[in-house]
A protein has these predicted regions:
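Catalytic-core regions of hydrolytic enzymes
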Residues: 2-135, 141-155, 162, 172, ...
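Active-site-adjacent mobile loop/cap segments within catalytic or ligand-binding domains
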Residues: 141-225
């Protein structure tokens, strides 16, 4: 006799942190009549709802409040989380910049990735400016987490661009303050450019955001297979 209830409970042994970027007095990027903090929260809530079917899910914020970057990682570590996913939107001075990209924590970063991280880190300068040397990062642990994070980032980006036909900007390693304090594999998803009307019209309906959350969740489920 197969005990379906037991298998369901076993699946829930994994804990996932869903982090909606920005919030409160920090609007994040703005454009197309939208604020990053609002869209990120909506997508994060939909992602959490999807993942709760199979996993323990904790949101770093579930309303329009500001949570410091260091606190976000702390929430995950205190819960012994198995995965940390941060939802964001990108922005550019040129409205033609478009597409999706996913980041993972890396001590080394390209000039482009460093620029994106600099913007996201600017909301909490005190924590963001703490030098990397102050973080006790075991090299083996770091490499394993980095490899798992990069694989997850690649799968999720593929899911998003294949479903929505957005430009595939790539997967990058960068020194994101919200990721570097996490003890688990962790990624930051830039779902699109808030400054690009095409990207934002792609995510303009409730159903499209539900689908976006589903594509991200699909990558998560593959990660835990």
């Amino acid at each position: 006799k197969v005990n379906f209830k037991k298998s369901k409970v076993q699946k829930k042994k994994y804990t996932i942190i869903v982090d909606a970027g920005h919030g409160g007095n920090d609007s994040g990027a703005t454009g197309s009549g939208l604020r990053e903090k609002d869209v990120a929260l909506d997508v994060a809530q939909k992602l959490a709802s999807n993942l709760k079917q199979d996993y323990n899910v904790i949101m770093t914020r579930s309303d329009d409040t500001f949570v410091p970057l260091g606190k976000r990682a702390e929430i995950g570590n205190d819960a012994n989380a198995d995965l940390f996913i941060s939802i964001h939107l990108n922005a550019a001075s040129s409205t033609s910049a478009n597409g999706s990209e996913v980041f993972y924590f890396s001590k080394k970063e390209s000039a482009y990735a460093a620029e994106v991280a600099k913007f996201e880190n600017s909301v909490d300068k005190g924590y963001a400016d703490v030098p990397l040397s102050d973080f006790i990062i075991n090299d083996i642990f770091y490499r394993v987490n980095q490899q798992k994070s990069a694989m997850l980032a690649t799968d999720i980006l593929d899911n998003i661009v294949n479903e929505f036909g957005l430009r595939k900007r790539g997967v990058f390693g960068a020194n994101f303050a919200v990721l570097r304090g996490s003890n688990s594999p962790s990624i930051l998803v830039e779902i699109g450019f808030v400054t690009n009307s095409g990207d934002m019209s792609t995510y303009g309906t409730d159903s499209s955001r539900v689908k976006l959350a589903s594509e991200i969740a699909q990558g998560v489920r593959k990660h835990f297979e």
